[in-house]
């Protein structure tokens, strides 16, 4: 079941071929002037240049063939050879009926699905998420949903930052602060003889009493500042990090507690944001792979000594800029950040063997990923092109710089979500919405409106661009906003409820009015928007479609009465258009990670 653009492209391709020209010139696109035509084909101009012929003559040949297509009410030439096409009401009605009868409202599945792993969010142990995690989380979640909806076998991995120097900082700071834990750590350099699972449970229970999430939130920032001012503390933290990574028993137990406490809190925040993961693989999961991987890189002749460190050179002939080598082992003998990333690629190949791994990470990390990916290709851990960084810009304040609190600090993600929720409550009351809801229902609706405001404000932009945070604008029920889309969704549900209560039923779609045509054309455009979003790993194409669809329904509803339609047949047709619009709109919203309430 092809959309109109694709099926007309096939017809135009056949027409060009019949005219003795390559079929690829028959590409059809949505019209730049929808007041004049539904679709256009500019292939005659390119074909003329290739064949050294007059473009208008070519267009005449193609149009003469296309005029026999029963789906087209008109095919005309404009200017030097542009071909304009208008679809007949009958063909558009038939296409609308196809979409209405399809559970996916016209969205197709891939002919050749792939295994895809998406690495996104990147939360860290003992560090509350901040606004910088917002874009990674919601863009990654949307891309994951989009790829899964298209038919790919997709795994989303949080890539948990649970290893490295910050762990040594925490261990050292807590041992300084709590004499009991300090003494316990001194007693447990390794598992004592006869140390049972019950003994371990007692130790973990003691940690739960003594170290809460609030403690981690307090201790880590202080330790981070302290290591910059206290060389002795910094050295102890480095030693603790090395001993943890080498398997010191007590440190491993304490580390597990840090991970457990942090993950519970992080999952709660992600749930509030409508984000979930299939995997919570941590950097620690590849720790045991690093040493054999380094030996393997050495055996392949890829490791090079450089001022005491060991590196992999990744520069290529023809590079237009310097591409730095991958630092694998430091001069002190430590594995580096990029080493862990390389080992993670190796681990993913062994455990999942994906055709594609996408990294949804800040655009500022582009150079790092270029280096890591090239090293992975050299080592044979991935096929060329199987690793892709889908970068994004920053969310900025009114000054155009990355968003901060009024005090100049980094805003926690939890606080940002609460700000959006509070503003949504205010907006609902201002608009007189939700008055008939219970307190619990009102809070749930406010949460959905607030999250929709944050998500749509972000996802309506191409991910590579930055945007200015403006909560007043984002939470408005008017304009291009998430709350506007939710309002239109709830409005359609209300129309359908009233229709059901009156006994009205949906029926065969017949298109006659301009507003009906416009709505049906947009329903048909869903597949094209999905294809564009999929190819470019860019949810903004889905967001744009959702907004245009909501706008088109609003105009349709104003111009084409449903319940007071002149005939029962007309009412049934318009009810089907309303039902189909709702289903497609909610599919698009779900791909953006936005949930619509039932009532407002």
Swiss-Prot record:
Keywords: Aminoacyl-tRNA synthetase, ATP-binding, Cytoplasm, Ligase, Nucleotide-binding, Protein biosynthesis. GO terms for molecular function: arginine-tRNA ligase activity; ATP binding. It is an enzyme of class 6 (ligase). It holds the Pfam family tRNA-synt_1d. InterPro entries: aa-tRNA-synth_I_CS, Arg-tRNA-ligase, Arg-tRNA-synth_N, Arg-tRNA-synth_N_sf, ArgRS_core, DALR_anticod-bd, Rossmann-like_a/b/a_fold, tRNAsynth_Ia_anticodon-bd. A motif ('HIGH' region) lies at residues 123-133. GO terms for cellular component: cytoplasm. PANTHER family: ARGININE--TRNA LIGASE, CYTOPLASMIC, ARGINYL-TRNA SYNTHETASE. This is Arginine--tRNA ligase. It comes from Caulobacter vibrioides (strain NA1000 / CB15N) (Caulobacter crescentus).
């Amino acid at each position: 079941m092809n959309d109109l653009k694709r099926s007309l492209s096939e017809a135009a391709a056949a027409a060009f071929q019949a005219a003795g020209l390559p079929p690829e010139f028959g590409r059809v696109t949505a019209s730049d002037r929808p007041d004049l035509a539904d679709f256009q084909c500019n292939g005659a101009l390119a074909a003329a240049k290739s064949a050294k012929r007059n473009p208008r003559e070519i267009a005449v040949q193609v149009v003469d063939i296309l005029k026999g297509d029963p789906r087209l009410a008109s095919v005309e030439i404009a200017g030097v050879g542009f071909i304009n096409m208008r679809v007949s009401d009958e063909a558009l009605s038939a296409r609308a009926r196809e979409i209405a009868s399809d559970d996916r409202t016209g969205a197709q599945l891939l002919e050749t699905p792939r295994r895809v792993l998406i690495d996104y969010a990147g939360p860290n142990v003992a560090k509350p998420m901040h606004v910088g995690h917002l874009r990674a989380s919601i863009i990654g979640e949307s891309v994951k949903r989009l790829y899964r909806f298209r038919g790919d076998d997709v795994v989303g991995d949080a890539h948990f930052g649970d290893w490295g120097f910050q762990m040594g900082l925490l261990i050292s700071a807590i041992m300084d602060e709590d004499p009991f834990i300090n003494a316990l750590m001194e007693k447990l350099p390794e598992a004592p003889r006869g140390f049972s699972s019950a003994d371990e449970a007692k130790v973990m229970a003691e940690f739960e009493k003594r170290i809460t999430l609030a403690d981690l939130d307090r201790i880590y920032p202080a330790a981070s500042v302290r290591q910059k001012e206290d060389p002795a503390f910094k050295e102890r933290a480095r030693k603790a990090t090395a001993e943890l990574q080498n398997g010191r028993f007590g440190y491993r137990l304490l580390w597990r507690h840090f991970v457990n406490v942090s993950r519970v809190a992080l999952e709660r925040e992600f749930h509030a944001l409508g984000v979930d993961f299939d995997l919570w693989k941590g950097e620690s999961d590849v720790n045991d792979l690093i040493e054999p991987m380094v030996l393997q890189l050495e055996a392949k002749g890829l490791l090079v000594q450089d001022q005491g460190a060991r590196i992999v050179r990744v520069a290529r002939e023809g590079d237009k800029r310097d591409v730095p080598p991958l630092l694998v082992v430091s001069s002190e003998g430590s594995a580096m950040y990029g080493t862990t990333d390389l080992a993670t690629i190796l681990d993913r190949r062994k455990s999942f063997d994906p055709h594609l791994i996408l990294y949804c990470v800040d655009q500022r990390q582009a150079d790092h990923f270029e280096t890591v990916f090239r090293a992975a290709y050299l080592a044979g851990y991935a096929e060329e092109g199987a690793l892709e960084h889908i970068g994004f810009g920053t969310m900025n304040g009114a000054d155009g710089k990355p968003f901060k609190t009024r005090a100049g600090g980094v805003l926690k993600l939890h606080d940002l979500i609460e700000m959006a929720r509070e503003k949504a409550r205010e907006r609902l009351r201002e608009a007189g919405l939700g008055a008939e809801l219970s307190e619990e229902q009102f809070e749930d609706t406010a949460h959905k409106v607030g999250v929709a405001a944050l998500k749509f404000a972000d996802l309506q932009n191409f991910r590579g661009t930055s945007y200015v945070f403006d909560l007043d604008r984002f939470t408005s029920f008017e304009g291009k906003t998430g709350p506007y889309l939710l309002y239109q969704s709830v409005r359609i549900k209300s129309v359908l409820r009233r229709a059901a209560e009156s006994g009205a039923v949906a029926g065969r779609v017949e298109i006659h009015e301009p507003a009906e045509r416009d709505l049906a054309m947009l329903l048909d455009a869903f597949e094209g928007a999905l294809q564009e979003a999929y190819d470019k790993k860019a949810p903004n194409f889905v967001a744009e479609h959702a907004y245009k669809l909501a706008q088109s329904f609003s105009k349709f509803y104003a111009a084409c009465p449903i319940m007071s339609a002149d005939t029962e047949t007309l009412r049934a047709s318009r009810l089907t258009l309303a039902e189909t619009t709702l289903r497609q709109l909610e599919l698009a919203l779900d791909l953006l990670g936005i949930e619509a309430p039932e009532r407002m």
